[in-house]
Structures are given as structure tokens and as C-alpha cells.
From Swiss-Prot:
Zn(2+) binds at residues 15, 18, 37, 40. InterPro entries: AAA+_ATPase, ATP-dep_Clp_protease_ClpX, ATPase_AAA_core, Clp_ATPase_C, Clp_protease_ATP-bd_su_ClpX, ClpX_bact, P-loop_NTPase, Znf_CppX_C4. The gene is clpX. Disulfide bonds: none annotated. ATP-dependent specificity component of the Clp protease. It directs the protease to specific substrates. Can perform chaperone functions in the absence of ClpP. CDD domains: RecA-like_ClpX. Coiled coil: none annotated. Belongs to the ClpX chaperone family. This is ATP-dependent Clp protease ATP-binding subunit ClpX. Keywords: ATP-binding, Chaperone, Metal-binding, Nucleotide-binding, Zinc. It comes from Zymomonas mobilis subsp. mobilis (strain ATCC 31821 / ZM4 / CP4).
Amino acid sequence: MTKLSGSDSKSTLYCSFCGKSQHEVRKLIAGPTVFICDECVELCNDIIREETRGALHKGDGSVPTPQEICTILDQYVIGQSKAKRVLSVAVHNHYKRLNHGGKDADVELAKSNILLIGPTGCGKTLLAETLARTFDVPFTMADATTLTEAGYVGEDVENIILKLLQASDYNVERAQRGIVYIDEIDKITRKSDNPSITRDVSGEGVQQALLKLMEGTTASVPPQGGRKHPQQEFLQVDTTNILFICGGAFAGLDRIIADRLEGKSIGFGAHVAAPDERRTGEILQECEPEDLLKFGLIPEFVGRLPVLATLEDLDQSALVRILTEPKNALVKQYQKLFELEDAKLEFTEDALAAIAKKGIERKTGARGLRSILEGILLDTMFELPSLEGVSEIIVDKDVAEGKKEPVRVFAQKEKDASPGAA
């Protein structure tokens, strides 16, 4: 609406919602015959945010079944069927507990955090990331190697919850239903068998600091980081319903397990397979809590990770499948890159097998496959944007083994396969 302000010939504009004039507010936004001020816009945003928070708990209460969760994991992670089953059941029960826990006051359902143990590059982190996508909940990854006790140089454990808050756009209620993945958890083990020798601020001290956070407590989280802004107001976050997944390679744990199994198998006719005869993943399947204690985790910490999932080594056939089958498979990624240059990228079966064999020799699991592909395709990716008429790039076994350059097929004479530059 428009009014004249006294003797002033110019008209003064007013907000159609609160009635304030354009001189009383910072901004007045015009619409067809109406106006709204910046204060009313902010108020509307607050109302919408409050309704969204309330809607978090008003869904139909349905949770994907373990089989549905496992099927989704299969689309992104190859192999590891046992670990997928363990994770699917644990996560299904966790979110079922959140949706139905308050309906029966007689029985209180406890939280089951998860410990993932497996060799490097076998899919621990990818499993956790895929789970977070499946449930559309806030997800954050933390690196245990950067954590220290409060008061020492390094990150406090509360920073993990701060990252989760940032992932949920500082929506506290949404963050309280999120998933936290703590990687490299094996790097915070006790540095000495004698706990009283010296203060272990990045090992046992971090385990103790994580205890209450993982079990469930109200954490005071500084929105801007606690050490640089000590005067700020703290946000209160209840960690009771946050699912913690810890993962680590636990190098050397297989030897501890093998020693324990060897001690049990004593007597006439007892056959014990030498550690060299069994792969690391096979030995880790036999892991017991006592092995984790001997490795350096404190009993209280092991007790707060009741669900144990061990992952297997990836063999050559699994690595070949990883290269081609998942939705975001490496071969599909590089084929997309070459499509952007109007060229088709093809790998022969022998080439994929040779690449997988190289990955096993490097002992870096699936993580090392990208660097192998980069090495094979680097020169081609460097030269291709400057070349004209290349319609196809073919990688065969000799190319994968470094014996020759990828084969380039030119559009004007597709019958002639030209190795190297034209």
C-alpha cells in the first residue's frame, strides 16, 4: 500500500505484512501491488525452519530392511558380503530404535556402534559413505590421527560433532540422528603396555575422551571452534542417537590373532596353517575382543563398539569387478572424461586383469587402481585435446603392462589403428 507522508510530495512505501515504512527497515521488496520487508522475510524463514525440524520425526516411520540396505551397498561396493550383512542389520536396528524407541517405555533399546577392521583399500570408508547416502542423514568423516586430549595441540574430540553440525547446516535435531565415521582408529592405540609410564595424549587419552561421546552425552560444541573463539556461545548436542562407525587397517593384528590360534591348537594331529598360508582378511575373521585389547585398545573403548565387521582382502577378480561394475566405477569415470574430448575409451579383458594384478602387487587394494590408470593414460590425456580426429582409444594387455602406448583410432581412417601419436 502507498501513503503520502505529510507535505512531502513523494510517496512512502509500507510493508504489507507488518505495516512498517521503508524508513524503518533496511530493505523493502516489491511484488505485484504488495511489499515485504527484510524483517518479515527473516521471520518467515524462522517459521519454515521450525516446521522442518519438527517434520524430522513425523515421517511414516519406515526404515529400509537389511536386504534393501545390502542391495544398495552392492551397487557401490564389490564383495565384502559378510561385512555388508553385519552393517545392514546394525544400521537397520539403529534407525528402527530411533523411530520406535519412545513407544515402549518398559524396554530401552541401547545403541550399537560399529567397528570395521580390514586391510587398506578394501572398502571401509566407502561402506560408511554409502550408508549415509542411503538414509539421507548428516554424515561426517574424522581422522583419529589428528585428535588429542583437551588442552593439547591438535583437535578436540568435540570437533567431530562440530563437523557433523556443519554437515547438517547447524540443524541440531538433524545432526543428532547422523552418522560419524572415525577413520584410522587403530592409530590411537595405547603406546605402551604399562599405562602409568607417561601421559599418552594422542593414544589412550583420545580413547578415554571418546568414551562418553560414543556412549551418549550432551556435548557442548563451539560453532566456530573452541580454541580461537573462547567467548562464543556453545551449542548443546545430544550424542545418544548418533551412530559411530570406527574403521582401521589394524596392521599387525593378524599376527596377534595367529599367535592366539596357534596356542589353542596344541596336541597330536593338530594342524595349524602358517600365517603365510592364510591371507590377512582370513585371519582377521577370527578376531576377538581380547585381540583388540592386546593390540592397544582399552577395554572400555572396545565395549562401546559391540558390532564387529571384518573385511576381506580383495583378490584379482574382485579388483576387475571394482574397475567396471559399480555405479561410479573407475573405468566409467575415465570413459566419461574421454567422452568430453569426443573419444571412446575401451579396455580389453586382458588389460583389466593386468591392471588388477598390478593393484595386488602394490598391496594398496582398490585405492591403488586410480594411480595405475593415471599412469597408463597420462600421456594420452595430455596429447588428446591437441589432436584432431581421434575417435577411439584402446588399452590392451601390453599397454597395461607398460610395453607400448595406448592405440589411437582416427575417425577418417578407422581401419588403421595407429599406436602412439599420429
